[in-house]
Amino acid sequence: MADGDSGSERGGGGGGGGGPGGFQPAPRGGGGGGGGPGGEQETQELASKRLDIQNKRFYLDVKQNAKGRFLKIAEVGAGGSKSRLTLSMAVAAEFRDSLGDFIEHYAQLGPSSPEQLAAGAEEGGGPRRALKSEFLVRENRKYYLDLKENQRGRFLRIRQTVNRGGGGFGGGPGPGGLQSGQTIALPAQGLIEFRDALAKLIDDYGGDEDELAGGPGGGAGGPGGGLYGELPEGTSITVDSKRFFFDVGCNKYGVFLRVSEVKPSYRNAITVPFKAWGKFGGAFCRYADEMKEIQERQRDKLYERRGGGSGGGDESEGEEVDED
């Protein structure tokens, strides 16, 4: 996908006379919406949201099939051509958090200098190096997020690649779910609007994904309902320039904790299965206690070097006076 018109030459889709249509719950009957031949197997569209950003149209559709609940993001370009991304609801939540980081970074950027714009013109109007980049990896999919700039403005380019393997939530086309990379370009001015719309869909339709991921019997009425029907809420902490996100989720393998480390320049994450939480917690507590003892010993040695012994002599003299 070429970069033009704030990121894409395909961004000329009609601005939609009706404007943003708000959230539209869709009929829950079975029906299309899935990509490829497998997409018609009882895929339900639960909600749809349209956004008109500059001269582009974006659609966010929450869908559900036998593999779980997922989100499709479509950018409609000139002539009705579309670029689509498919995200599980868990990845959509990570994507929402990443958008928050890009929004903060974009807000801190100053206007482009004439020299920078001239350099972009000499390069044919193509995007310069990324102003900020992150990537997400989940199962057989990778998502690359790059905040870029060309003569038309700044934009967030989001590219999805799918490795060969089992088909994903959307039932991707091709043998074994193989699918060429898809890219959308979101004008930077619409980042907040896009993030807020995504967050609303996640709040409204992401809560049951844990039950869906558990498969048959994992719902509230099944034997696993107590485990998959309710999970702890996610949280985050900030340390210096880093942010750590703690998100509890579940899939067919069980409950897990995803710990994401986010800095302005990169994002990394680990997944800890539920059965290892106690060991991880014990290890953290043990190291915290050991470091506390080490710090206390170091403080004691420092006091001694600064003449702590003289204080002891004063106490001795004081005791002798009292005895007299």
UniProtKB/Swiss-Prot annotation:
Subunit structure: Homodimer, heterodimer with PURA and heterotrimer with PURA and YBX1/Y-box protein 1. Interacts with MYOCD and SRF.
Span list, region DNA-binding: 37-263
Modified residues annotated as N-acetylalanine in this record: A2
GO BP annotation list: negative regulation of DNA-templated transcription; negative regulation of transcription by RNA polymerase II; positive regulation of transcription by RNA polymerase II
Residues with Phosphoserine modification: S6, S8, S113, S310, S316
Effect of G215S: Reduced transcriptional repression of MYOCD
GO cellular component, as recorded: nucleoplasm; nucleus
Modified residues (Omega-N-methylarginine): R28, R164, R306
Its job: Transcriptional regulator which can act as an activator or a repressor. Represses the transcription of ACTA2 in fibroblasts and smooth muscle cells via its ability to interact with the purine-rich strand of a MCAT-containing element in the 5' flanking region of the gene. Represses the transcription of MYOCD, capable of repressing all isoforms of MYOCD but the magnitude of the repressive effects is most notable for the SMC-specific isoforms.
Pfam hit, one: PurA
Residue numbers spanned by region Disordered: 1-47, 297-324
Record family assignment: Belongs to the PUR DNA-binding protein family.
UniProt-recorded name of the protein: Transcriptional regulator protein Pur-beta
N6-acetyllysine modifications at: K279
Temperature dependence: Thermostable.
DNA-binding recorded as keyword: yes
GO MF annotation terms: DNA-binding transcription factor activity; DNA-binding transcription factor binding; DNA-binding transcription repressor activity, RNA polymerase II-specific; double-stranded DNA binding; double-stranded telomeric DNA binding; mRNA binding; purine-rich negative regulatory element binding; RNA binding
Phenotype on disruption: Liver-specific knockdown in db/db mice results in a decrease in fasting blood glucose and glucose levels in fed conditions. Mice show reduced glucagon sensitivity and hepatic gluconeogenesis, reduced CREB phosphorylation, reduced expression of PCK1 and G6PC and a significant down-regulation of ADCY6 expression.
